[in-house]
Design a protein with these regions (language model features):
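Transmembrane beta-barrel outer-membrane domains
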Residues: 101-105, 151-157, 193-199, 215, ...
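Detector for outer-membrane/organellar transmembrane beta-barrel domains
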Residues: 195-266
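Structural signature of outer-membrane beta-barrel domains
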Residues: 98-100, 130-132, 182-186, 225-231, ...
């Protein structure tokens, strides 16, 4: 019996070289959370601060599950894809620093991308391996956090994507379908870092290449889809959002510069309408690549983020 596309991809990926397997193993192990052994703290300070009394809804109901009231990696705007699949597998490790008054955050994340079926299908998994945060009392109180000193280490959610090439190199623009599941593996919901709840999004991305006589490639890009995630609102347990993005690539001599504006528009209007500008510069070598990105939050996600990525390029699965 034929395996589902997603499982088939992992089966094929298992035959990749040892370097790739070891990196993925490290990626998964780093996301495993160790059980807490510390003594249960006294929550009197939180109860007094927010006027909580016995019989009122539990503290989880006070956390606002939206990007404006969680950490920078809790409900991020999905990456703008380019309407087509890359031919080579990639393993990427990224160091990020998020600048925001009162909540400076640093993290290390990982990504694995595996194309197969002659470049018609690909799978991707990614997530924050470890995050360090240190926010001030004002941020703590605004987000109803129960982390009294606002300092700690958190582990991120894991994302699984399946991508299918619908059109490529035709008169019609390149078109890529992406469906992504977000797990609830993120930790420290009590510190308002992650939502401790699943979500998913699906989108179509489009692009068209235009090349000048000088060899400069210009590629406009667009994205349209939806994003849905679970909340703690007992009357509306799910928030749905319109996902959007547009931008362009400039490519020449293994260099690529990208600029875009992306975001999503939630229906609850409780800090669930993030919008951001994205700028990236990538340099490709034979078997590796370097990527530098800057993200500038405009609305409901006000971090300014720098990312530095190292990428290993491997042969595609067959």
């Amino acid at each position: 019996m034929a395996l589902p596309i997603f499982l088939k991809g992992f089966f094929i990926f298992g035959r990749q070289i040892d370097t790739m397997r070891n990196l993925i193993l490290f990626f998964f192990l780093a996301l495993i959370r160790l059980p807490a052994t510390a003594q249960e703290p006294d929550w009197g300070w939180w109860n007094n601060l927010h006027g909580w009394e016995s019989g009122m809804p539990g503290w989880r109901n006070w956390i606002i599950i939206s990007p404006a009231y969680l950490g920078p990696n809790a409900l991020p705007v999905p990456e703008l894809k380019r309407g087509f699949l890359l031919n080579k597998s990639e393993i990427e490790v990224t160091a990020s620093t998020h600048f925001y008054s009162g909540d400076p955050t640093q993290d290390i994340s990982g990504r694995a991308y595996i194309p197969f079926a002659e470049g018609k299908i690909a799978i991707e998994m990614y997530g924050v391996i470890i995050e360090h945060y240190n926010y001030i009392e004002e941020i703590r109180n605004e987000r109803f956090s129960r982390d009294e000193d606002g300092k700690g280490i958190a582990f991120g959610d894991l994302y699984f994507s399946t991508m299918i090439q619908l059109f490529k190199d035709r008169k019609f623009p390149n078109t890529l379908l992406r469906v992504t599941l977000r797990t609830a593996s993120g930790s420290n919901i009590e510190a308002a870092r992650y939502s401790d709840a699943p979500g998913y999004f699906a989108d179509l991305s489009f692009s068209k290449d235009f090349t000048s006589k000088e060899g400069l490639l210009f590629r406009p890009i667009g994205m349209l889809g939806f994003y849905s995630w679970q909340t703690n609102d007992e009357l509306n347990l799910q928030n749905d959002a319109l996902l959007y993005g547009m931008g362009a690539d400039l490519e020449k001599n293994a260099w690529r510069f990208t600029g875009s504006c992306t975001g999503y528009f939630g229906y609850k209007n409780n800090g669930d309408r993030p919008m951001q500008l994205n700028f990236g510069l990538r340099k490709d070598f034979k078997n590796t690549a370097l990527n530098v990105q800057y993200q500038h939050g405009l609305h409901d996600w006000l971090y300014k983020t720098l990312r530095f990525s190292f990428i290993w390029k491997l042969n595609p699965a067959h």
